[in-house]
């Protein structure tokens, strides 16, 4: 498989992110906490390059080539982490939703996603910033794996039982979430938002490792 080298920092969207972080940092200084969203983690980026259907087949039939692609995307993702940190982000994050149990088994997650997510965490720490990992869907079957990664923060979906998140991750890392972004934030009422927020507060009562928000991207109609 041929690898292609290019200057990620010259990408227009990356340039917009860099400039936005710099403007916010200059204006607010340390008054606000800036999360630099580096978007896709290595497994997810490889999935996007090949398309989900083809990449799932690659994992089963062309494992060596699939791993080479993930190694390549790991390098690309690490560069974005460095760029965001150098721009002034207080924290960086990646999303790896295709690596969740809704798409692949927990065993496949441990082989093809977990090691590369951990390398993103290590890269962030080398840059002196905390790291957040986002995974959509029901992550119940990989919570114990996540607990061993020493993440600073995790952003999980409403589909994962909050009691289990608190049990396995509550004393290890900060939780961002887990309000339903569509059913509650976009289509629900203010009472629905208040009720779901209170449920989260009740379960995490006494635990400061919580930042309440949507567990995934909020639709623009919200």
Predicted feature descriptions by range:
Residues 2-222:
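Active-site loop segments of alpha/beta catalytic cores
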């Amino acid at each position: 498989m041929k690898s292609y080298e290019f200057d990620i920092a010259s990408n227009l969207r990356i340039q917009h992110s860099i400039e936005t972080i710099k403007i916010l940092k200059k204006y607010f200084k340390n008054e606000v906490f800036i999360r630099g969203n580096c978007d896709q983690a290595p497994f997810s980026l490889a999935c996007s390059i090949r398309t989900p259907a083809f990449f799932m087949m690659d994992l089963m039939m062309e494992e060596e080539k699939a791993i080479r692609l993930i190694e390549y995307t790991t390098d690309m993702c690490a560069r974005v982490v460095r760029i965001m940190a150098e721009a002034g982000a207080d924290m960086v994050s990646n999303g790896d939703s295709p690596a969740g149990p809704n798409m692949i088994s927990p065993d496949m997650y441990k082989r093809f996603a977990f090691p590369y997510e951990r390398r993103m965490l290590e890269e962030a720490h080398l840059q002196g910033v905390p790291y957040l990992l986002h995974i959509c869907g029901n992550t119940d079957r990989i919570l114990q794996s996540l607990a061993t990664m020493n993440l600073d923060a995790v952003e999980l979906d409403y589909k994962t039982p909050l009691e289990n998140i608190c049990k396995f991750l509550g004393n290890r890392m900060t939780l961002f979430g887990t309000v339903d972004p569509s059913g509650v934030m976009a289509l629900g009422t203010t009472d629905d938002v208040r009720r779901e927020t209170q449920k989260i507060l009740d379960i995490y009562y006494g635990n400061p490792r919580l930042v309440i928000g949507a567990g995934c991207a909020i639709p623009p109609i919200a």
